[in-house]
């Protein structure tokens, strides 16, 4: 055993003083002093349980003692009689065994591979032990779940990630997926339950038993987000549902995650074999699949962006050359060739590395370096986490913990440890880049083109100076460019830029100026880019991004030249610069039906319990997607209808995620309303009105929302802090509003307007579906029925969605007096015009003026309300373009008129989109769009002016 270093020997005195009476420096073995000096977690544990220290002193932990964990836990649970005592025993058992593992690891009594095995087996033992106890308890309460033939159904648990691979780290959370085989009902209990309900309740109790903090701590943080559909999907799925999902919808990243999936309990029963056989074809393709490399490259890019976003420095997991890159290297070979090479199908990394070497897929020296780096990094990670039982991969900044790690890694001092770490990570990065990396580099031609601009940047030319590279610019433009450069340099003098930042900036600016100043609009473009540069000069990582990736720099220049809105967004949120790295995604927005899945994958990297990071991640995702939509709009690859479609699908994905976050937080606090115990879903819906309801969102649109529930009276929640069910839904809606409007460093998510709810701002924030129907039928004004034409459910249970759709259809198909309706719609339009009148009389307000967008919307709404009782099909859509289509199809409006109004409508909306990209108000010269305006005004007179 290595003696304690000098700083640790001094700290040891403090440790001894904290121990209970009976423990003195002389009574402690050298081993005990070393472990307790190294790990505050071990020290706190033996202070609370001195008998554990005596146990360790008398008999050291053994390498194979993991084989006894199940038996030891069975003994510990023998006296458990309820969930509370189960939770206590699980927590104490986990802590006792973790102290033993920390002891063995710190003193190197057991090799590092075995430590990973012990940590994984401990987690598996606790999961299986808790599941089995709770399964029996649930069966006593509700009966045994059976298939139609009466065969009992088990709960199968897939351990994902490092747990599945047998490589769990010291303070890891656990990723799980729950499944059961076949549908059916419980038998033999006090009351029958559908199998789905039984297993959902069992799953909820199991998560609580493992995850909920008590006075004894928690067992493991449980993350269920890898299951199909993530948090918005069922907690437990049948085999049939799992198979359907992975065959029809499984994404690449889910395939990679499934490589390490392992059934907890290592059962070899028929159900377990069936589940393994079902999943294998999804994970390992029969053919050699080289598309994996680009997919993994994209995933690595996402992680690199996350490191930049969150400012993760000295991160041995996610940083360049870290643990994640070794995992990616191994997964490349597993996913490309695993279908044909069974030896590559191992869940564990080190055996797979051996297979890669045996198949000669990597040079022997590379494999040896990766193995050494992996074991070095995993030991360092585990030691780091065992200091405080804390889930971290970031190297410490304080002297004590640095001294601890240096000693634990058998280095003379901290600099020596950092040197060894740097060498290992450099070896990993080299192999990773050769296999997966795609770093760009400047061509010799680029360097030659940029060289003359070095003089412009470094010599600080004056306004009246002349230089050949600026000769092509007009005098005024040349003066503006030189002034901008000079002003930017003055601004830099006020900023605390380090030597590395200066070096990167001096490397970047000649390339940037060469690209900007070759343009005719050089002065305008440079004026938009310099504020962005001023904002990132103290964040060297972003300067390096632009310097090292010439393609990203070119896209930055092109987008800033095209749109001041994009330039402003990039300046405000520099993390968006990451989006410029891949032109394939930059100008190709996410598929309209894939926003939810992309967001789900994005949020998986953020701890579920970290509300602040979750809020940031939502905002960052939205901004990145907005940038991609705007880039495609500018490039002309998205027509106006598609721009709005994408903005609307993005908003719906955001609503879905916000409701999920709010729901999770509320249920953790109060439990869920008891009426949901007997059914699937949440009994809650979000209805989108206006531009959201009509699929017509713009870049800066707010969201018009109302909230509905179907909670009966006198229902309470089932949590420890009981509240009235309707109060729960009110607080849920308030929480949703809060999550949307909270301002973080990345801004707000959306402005939300809930005033279209029954009784407006004076009404309840959330309304029961029955009360909503009653209000619409007996109290709502005509303008509220107009608003309903453009309303649809954007989040909600199928049951509530159907209920809302029925109310909407009933209201719109109500027979109305034509003259009265015409008068009321026309008068409402005149009131709006008076209230929102154009302040620029010499300009045409595209939205509000006569012949503008709002007139077209009112014409469509009027005709639906006027004729839907005769033609119910008019109620099908909530967007103006398809409503105009329906009016023509149903013989209400002449087809030529409907097409002409549609063209006018899309033309005007297209102009609004482009004005927004230029950060210009929504009005133009009076001479613009005269043809469209005349056509709309003629249609208005035809339908809405009394005759």
From Swiss-Prot:
Swiss-Prot/TrEMBL cofactor(s): Mg(2+)
GO molecular function: [glutamate-ammonia-ligase] adenylyltransferase activity; [glutamine synthetase]-adenylyl-L-tyrosine phosphorylase activity; ATP binding; magnesium ion binding
Region listing for Adenylyl transferase, in residue ranges: 450-947
Pfam families: GlnD_UR_UTase (PF08335), GlnE (PF03710)
UniProt-listed Enzyme Commission number(s): 2.7.7.89, 2.7.7.42
GO cellular component, one term: cytosol
Keywords for this protein: ATP-binding, Magnesium, Multifunctional enzyme, Nucleotide-binding, Nucleotidyltransferase, Transferase
Matches recorded under InterPro entries: GlnE, GlnE_rpt_dom, NT_sf, PII_UdlTrfase/GS_AdlTrfase
Membership in a protein family: Belongs to the GlnE family.
Name recorded for this polypeptide: Bifunctional glutamine synthetase adenylyltransferase/adenylyl-removing enzyme
Annotated source species: Salmonella paratyphi A (strain AKU_12601)
Gene of this entry: glnE
């Amino acid at each position: 055993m290595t003696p304690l270093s000098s700083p640790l020997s001094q700290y040891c005195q403090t440790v001894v003083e904290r121990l209970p009476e009976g423990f003195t420096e002389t009574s402690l073995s050298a081993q005990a002093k070393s472990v307790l000096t190294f790990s505050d977690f071990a020290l706190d544990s033996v202070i609370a349980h001195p008998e554990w220290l005596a146990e360790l002193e008398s008999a050291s932990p053994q390498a194979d003692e993991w084989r006894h964990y199940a038996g030891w836990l069975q003994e510990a649970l023998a006296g458990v009689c309820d969930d509370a005592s189960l939770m206590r025993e699980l927590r104490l058992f986990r802590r006792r065994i973790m102290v033993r593992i920390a002891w063995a690891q710190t003193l190197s009594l057991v090799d590092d591979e075995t430590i990973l095995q012990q940590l994984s087996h401990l987690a598996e033992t606790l999961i299986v032990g808790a599941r089995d106890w709770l399964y029996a308890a649930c069966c006593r309460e509700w009966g045994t779940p059976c298939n139609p033939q009466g065969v009992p159904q088990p709960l199968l648990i897939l351990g994902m990630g490092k747990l599945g691979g047998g490589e769990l780290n010291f303070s890891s959370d656990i990723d799980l997926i729950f499944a059961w085989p076949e549908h059916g009902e419980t038998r033999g209990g006090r009351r029958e339950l559908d199998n789905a309900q039984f297993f959902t309740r069992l799953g909820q109790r199991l998560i609580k038993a493992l995850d909920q903090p008590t006075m004894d701590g928690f067992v493991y943080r449980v993350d269920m987000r890898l299951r199909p559909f993530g948090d918005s999907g069922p907690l437990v799925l049948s085999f049939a549902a799992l198979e359907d999902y992975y065959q029809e919808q499984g994404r690449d990243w889910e395939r990679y995650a499934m490589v390490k999936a392992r059934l907890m309990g290592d059962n070899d029963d028929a159900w377990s074999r069936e589940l393994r056989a079902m999943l294998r074809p999804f994970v390992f393709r029969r053919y050699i699949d080289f598309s994996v490399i680009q997919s993994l490259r994209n995933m690595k890019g996402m992680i690199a962006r996350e490191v930049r976003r969150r400012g993760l420095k000295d991160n041995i997991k996610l940083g360049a050359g870290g643990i994640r890159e070794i995992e990616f290297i191994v997964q490349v070979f597993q996913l490309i060739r695993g279908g044909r090479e069974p030896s590559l199908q191992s869940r564990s990394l080190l055996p797979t590395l051996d297979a890669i070497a045996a198949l000669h897929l990597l040079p022997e020296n590379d494999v040896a370096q990766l193995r050494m780096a992996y074991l070095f990094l995993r030991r360092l990670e585990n030691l780091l986490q065992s200091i405080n039982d804390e889930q971290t991969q970031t190297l410490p900044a304080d002297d004590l913990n640095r001294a601890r790690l240096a000693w634990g890694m058998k280095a003379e001092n901290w600099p020596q440890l950092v040197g060894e770490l740097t060498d290992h990570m450099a070896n990993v990065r080299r192999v990773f880049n050769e296999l997966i990396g795609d770093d760009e580099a400047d061509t010799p031609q680029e360097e030659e083109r940029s060289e003359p601009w070095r003089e412009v940047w470094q010599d600080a030319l004056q306004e009246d100076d002349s230089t050949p590279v600026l000769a092509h610019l007009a005098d005024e433009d040349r003066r503006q460019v030189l002034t901008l450069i000079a002003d930017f340099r003055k601004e830099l003098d006020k900023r605390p830029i380090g030597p590395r930042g200066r070096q990167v900036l001096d490397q970047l600016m000649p390339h940037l100026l060469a690209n900007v100043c070759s343009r005719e609009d050089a002065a305008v473009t440079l004026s938009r880019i310099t504020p962005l540069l001023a904002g990132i000069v103290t964040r060297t990582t972003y300067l390096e991004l632009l310097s090292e990736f010439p393609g990203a720099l070119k896209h930055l220049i092109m987008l800033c030249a095209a749109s001041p809105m994009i330039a402003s967004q990039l300046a405000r949120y520099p993390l968006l610069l990451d989006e410029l790295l891949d032109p394939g995604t930059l100008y190709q927005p996410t598929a309209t039906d894939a926003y939810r899945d992309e967001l789900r994958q994005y949020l998986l990297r953020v701890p579920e319990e970290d509300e602040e990071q979750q809020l940031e991640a939502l905002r960052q995702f939205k901004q990145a997607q907005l940038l991609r939509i705007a880039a495609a709009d500018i490039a002309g690859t998205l027509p106006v209808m598609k721009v709005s479609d994408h903005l609307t699908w993005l908003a719906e994905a955001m609503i879905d995620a916000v409701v999920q976050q709010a729901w999770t937080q509320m249920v953790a606090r109060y439990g869920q309303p008891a009426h949901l115990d007997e059914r699937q879903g949440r009994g809650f819906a979000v209805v989108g009105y206006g531009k959201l309801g009509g699929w017509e969102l713009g870049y800066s649109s707010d969201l018009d929302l109302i909230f509905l529930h179907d909670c009966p009276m006198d229902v309470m929640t089932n949590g420890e802090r009981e509240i009235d069910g309707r109060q729960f839904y009110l607080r849920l809606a308030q929480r949703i509003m809060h999550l949307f409007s909270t301002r973080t460093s990345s801004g707000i998510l959306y402005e939300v307007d809930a005033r279209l709810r029954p009784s407006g701002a004076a009404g309840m924030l959330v309304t029961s579906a029955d009360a909503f129907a009653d209000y619409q039928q007996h109290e709502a004004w005509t303008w509220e029925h107009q608003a309903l034409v453009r309303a649809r459910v954007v989040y909600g249970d199928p049951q509530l969605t159907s209920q809302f759709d029925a109310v909407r259809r009933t209201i719109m198909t109500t027979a109305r007096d034509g003259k009265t309706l015409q008068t009321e719609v026309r008068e409402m339009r005149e009131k709006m015009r008076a209230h929102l009148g154009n302040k620029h009389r010499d300009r045409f307000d595209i939205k509000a003026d006569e012949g503008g967008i709002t007139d077209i919307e009112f014409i469509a709404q009027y005709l639906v309300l006027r004729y839907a009782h005769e033609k119910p099909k008019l109620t099908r859509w909530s967007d103006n373009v398809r409503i105009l289509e329906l009016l023509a199809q149903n013989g209400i409006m002449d087809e030529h008129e409907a097409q002409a109004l549609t063209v006018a409508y899309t033309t005007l909306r297209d102009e609004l989109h482009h004005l927004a990209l230029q950060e210009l108000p929504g009005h133009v010269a009076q001479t613009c769009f005269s043809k469209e305006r005349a056509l709309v005004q003629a249609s208005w007179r035809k339908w809405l002016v009394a005759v």
